[in-house]
Amino acid sequence: MCEDQQTPVTLTIADYQSDLRVISFSGLDALNEVYRFDIHLIGIDPDLDLHNLLERGAFLGFGQVDQGIHGRICQASRVYAGQHVSLYHLVLVPTLEKLAHRQQRRVYQDLTAPQLVVQLLEAHGIEADAQRFEHMTGLYPRRALCIQHDESDLHLLQRVCEEEGIHFRFEHDAERHVLVFSDDAVGFPVQAVPARFKHLKPAGPCPPTLLHMAETLSMHHGRRRAVERVDEDGACPFAPIDAQPGSPAANQPFQPLGSAAGPRDHQQALRLQRGARTLQRIRCERRDIRGRSNHAALRSGQILQVLDHPERWFNDQWLLTEVDHWARQLQVLRGLNPHDTLAILRVLADQQCGRPRRSRCPAMVIAIASASSPGRCRFVRRSNVDARQ
């Protein structure tokens, strides 16, 4: 830990006046996930109206001015009520978390993946000023059908993003947070201050520093279960055409994307895109590199430059995929001035695109269900249903 008197932690609640002061917080901020921050505060009012706090926007400030996490308060509780001071617990989440509370059965027709994502967001009041797509370079054809069966809107949104290789992150300021989608590494912002590796001093003030960074190796890490995706015509798009049982090698010849033997039509270009993104996702899952820092400004989805690490290959740019924040300020209780902050990091090489891991699968429909269409319904007859529905 480092004592940093320049990073006080504050919580500003929209349209609400209180004497609540933050004594500690912890929170996990990860790429392609919904963040959650647990905040402990003290106040002199033992009868604080907790219902009045729910659904209010709030900004948890830590680090430099205007740096922090914005969200909405989804939980509020009184942990201890004393004669002179009371302890409260608040939970801060993004507006996107609302999608986790609606589970339904529905069929979406003739929508691209970005169109489906926008429709899900707007159904929960997340309008265009609170979400955007940037640096979108891929092909996203319309899906004839996309089935939502007993899964939440959030699960469906994350599943579609995982299937298409679209990542999302959050941008924060004191007034709001914005949900940002992209499929290109160019969309990741670069952290302005590089992280210099330095061993922790036993005492005294310490500037923003990378305290630890190392790779975790495992015998079982990266072992994957083979999955064969069947295309609409019943053929596996990545299977060698001329492969024979018992042949010494069944690899297709490699052709650069820009060569004459490259994609000749839309379907072939789409297959190459899916294959490339699957390979990128596998590469992202192969290595497990973690670190620790007292740098309060680190957020998931940022590119961080590492300097002065004793292992030279770590001195490079890294994509932060997960940041586990923890902080406390004991001077609120004791009249002292220690500010302990810690961020546990998980990173990828800058060249990786941060493709989301395929951790969410569509629900299995095991019974016949009736449905009604409010408008014109176009039925699709084919021998195989697309596995990405």
Identify the role of each PLM range:
Residues 1-389:
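Amphipathic alpha-helical and helix-coil boundary elements used as assembly
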